[in-house]
């Protein structure tokens, strides 16, 4: 197996990153249930197994990377044999917070530690830059991303229905950086 390397993205990576298959298949969804009571609203998420795997359209425009990559504080590319196989894009937010807006791994390289490597690079970048917290946003149907967040100690911290252009629910996970 090829050794995976993580480094800052360079211009030559962009065509391969934008052309990557960004879609994911999921067997579960976090289903939102809102219950209104006299003095409160209770939001509960239940993990529900779907009758069959569903394909998920990536909620962001992959081609926007060409315009945004120089404006982002950091974008990391994962490589195998000098070929881009994944990337992670970060944004700064007020209050010493960093936000992972894109985390994509080529289908042939999924479940091989690539996303974990990218996330570790983002966390190291956040610590070096003095960020206190790192946030991840994921679609409520993206079970692989939810599992990744949980595996790395990220805690569920909120949601926004109709967050994406696809009108999907976004789940937010965060962890403190040390």
Predicted regions and their residues:
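Active-site acidic-Proline motif in GNAT/NAT acetyltransferases
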Residues: 106-112, 140-141
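Conserved short alpha-helix immediately C-terminal to the canonical SAM/SAH-binding motif I
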Residues: 118, 142-145
């Amino acid at each position: 197996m090829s050794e995976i390397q993580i480094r800052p993205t360079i211009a030559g990576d962009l065509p391969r990153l934008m052309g990557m298959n960004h879609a994911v298949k999921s067997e579960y969804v976090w289903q939102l249930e809102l219950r209104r009571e006299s003095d409160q609203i209770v939001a509960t998420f239940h993990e529900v197994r779907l009758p069959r795997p569903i394909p998920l359209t990536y909620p962001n425009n992959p081609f926007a990377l060409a315009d945004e990559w120089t404006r982002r504080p950091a974008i990391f590319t994962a490589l195998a044999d000098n070929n881009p196989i994944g990337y992670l894009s970060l944004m700064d937010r007020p209050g010493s917070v960093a936000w992972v807006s894109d985390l994509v791994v080529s289908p042939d390289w999924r479940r091989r530690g690539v996303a974990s490597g990218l996330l570790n690079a983002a966390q190291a970048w956040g610590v070096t830059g003095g960020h206190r917290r790192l946030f991840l946003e994921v679609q409520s149907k993206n079970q692989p991303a939810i599992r990744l967040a949980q595996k790395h100690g990220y805690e569920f911290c909120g949601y926004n229905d109709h967050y994406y252009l696809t009108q999907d629910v976004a789940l937010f996970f965060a962890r403190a950086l040390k």
